[in-house]
Swiss-Prot record:
Protein name (Swiss-Prot/TrEMBL): Glutamine--fructose-6-phosphate aminotransferase [isomerizing]
Organism lineage string: Bacteria, Pseudomonadati, Bacteroidota, Bacteroidia, Bacteroidales
Annotated organism of origin: Bacteroides thetaiotaomicron (strain ATCC 29148 / DSM 2079 / JCM 5827 / CCUG 10774 / NCTC 10582 / VPI-5482 / E50)
Protein task: Catalyzes the first step in hexosamine metabolism, converting fructose-6P into glucosamine-6P using glutamine as a nitrogen source.
Gene behind this protein: glmS
One biological process term in Gene Ontology: protein N-linked glycosylation
Keywords of this entry: Aminotransferase, Cytoplasm, Glutamine amidotransferase, Repeat, Transferase
EC number of this enzyme: 2.6.1.16
Any one GO cellular component localisation term in the record: cytosol
GO molecular function terms noted in the UniProt entry: carbohydrate derivative binding; glutamine-fructose-6-phosphate transaminase (isomerizing) activity
Start and end residues of each Glutamine amidotransferase type-2 domain: 2-221
Disulphide connectivity of cysteines: none
Amino acid sequence: MCGIVGYIGKRKAYPILIKGLKRLEYRGYDSAGVALISDNQQLNVYKTKGKVSELENFVTQKDISGTVGIAHTRWATHGEPCSVNAHPHYSSSEKLALIHNGIIENYAVLKEKLQAKGYVFKSSTDTEVLVQLIEYMKVTNRVDLLTAVQLALNEVIGAYAIAILDKEHPEEIIAARKSSPLVVGIGEDEFFLASDATPIVEYTDKVVYLEDGEIAVINRGKELKVVDLSNVEMTPEVKKVELKLGQLEKGGYPHFMLKEIFEQPDCIHDCMRGRINVEANNVVLSAVIDYKEKLLNAKRFIIVACGTSWHAGLIGKHLIESFCRIPVEVEYASEFRYRDPVIDEHDVVIAISQSGETADTLAAVELAKSRGAFIYGICNAIGSSIPRATHTGSYIHVGPEIGVASTKAFTGQVTVLTMLALTLAREKGTIDETQYLNIVRELNSIPGKMKEVLKLNDKLAELSKTFTYAHNFIYLGRGYSYPVALEGALKLKEISYIHAEGYPAAEMKHGPIALIDAEMPVVVIATQNGLYEKVLSNIQEIKARKGKVIAFVTKGDTVISKIADCSIELPETIECLDPLITTVPLQLLAYHIAVCKGMDVDQPRNLAKSVTVE
């Protein structure tokens, strides 16, 4: 959600800040703004509703001088999207300017107290309350900005990542975090600040990830200072970012989403590199081997995740239960954290998150840890909060995912879950050796089969034109394909704004069949694995009610192709690996329908890439 960028050094701040905001556009936003300490020591704030490009147009005739500044993209939580509610926010004296990502839960109480003391508010945001509170602490207690920030944050309930400028101390930025990510980049006589490393990698590969409760004091020409809310000095741990600048560009594709769909064969190969020994037909996840006893002796696994990651978790449940014979529960992290779950030291919790910053998933991890559970993380963003909070885990190594609608992260998560299940099953002795070797060999062939699927791009682009009229879609699948149906429906609704729902195919008769008529497209995953004959019966039921069937079938299928309105043939694979093949054409179908409808595919309305608030 909201993006934060900051700079202090010798260069002009504004171009760095604007470029940084553009790097963070993928996080989702509805307004943008910038605050600069100008060459003549003025604190200038400029902000607008809309895209970063609109902010650029707005400041054309403004004073954008200065080598110190902060900038922000806002995703509305308190107050509608408008320039008044956009960040940065001034304090009453206009000597302080603050940007904030997160939610101040007790803002209403704090606002009433400040209003009683004569403070006037221009916006309806919780962020303006925070900057006014900091100024109140600074003036009333006659303290410096750092102390005022510490005093104010000790009164705050909620999540925050903040950066603040003080006109009276133009050589300094104060930044702090709690339950919302913040990264400090360290350059040569300059510092960078951002919500994640993407705006920083162009300038430096040395970063410090702030921990919860830490405050960074960033001064020009001085060493980075990190303290906690009690002013105890911390030792910042400098890490190297492995991110490459080229990974953040479209590379000739019209959208990041299409690029990321086409990257999947290479991404899955990278995900498996060093983990699958092709010659020995063996899968080894070091995280499993290192904690073998804990994992093998677990009484159950609990997978916590949100959105697309939750769909991957459903596939993980099927894999682990089938291969390892360990019971698995899959929970929405947002529900798990609030329902007082029964959990103890005999449980293993698998936390899945692309960004590693998903607020509900992170909170679920902390809850499970507090009750003695062993935590295994599956994330993409290296150095993010969830990997730092877990006992062990596996990165999916698919590279940065910029498109808001997840594609390669999903298949990467499924790949890691497959390798996790296979490694555990072999260690546990619950999988037949012949079956194990067949799956490992087939898993190694998946990148090549994904490339075959991508050759269907033009056919799916043409097919999509037929269905732009639709207001509703139904997606059906059985077994491993049911979570794929859910994911396909989610992709369509996210980027095309067409209402779509996924169901287990057998559940169609328990309600959804009432919706089927000549205007209802039904996507059916009907590969020749497992329950093919039953899915065939479901298709016949749909056609009997004049529904439009788009069937994804195994290459060579001659039965369903005669019944369906359209059939797309896919390479054959083993049933448990079907999701890695069948997901890709559903991503392409959703993408092309959205493009045909003229939608903003990479930044769909109301959505954020990294959901860092509840």
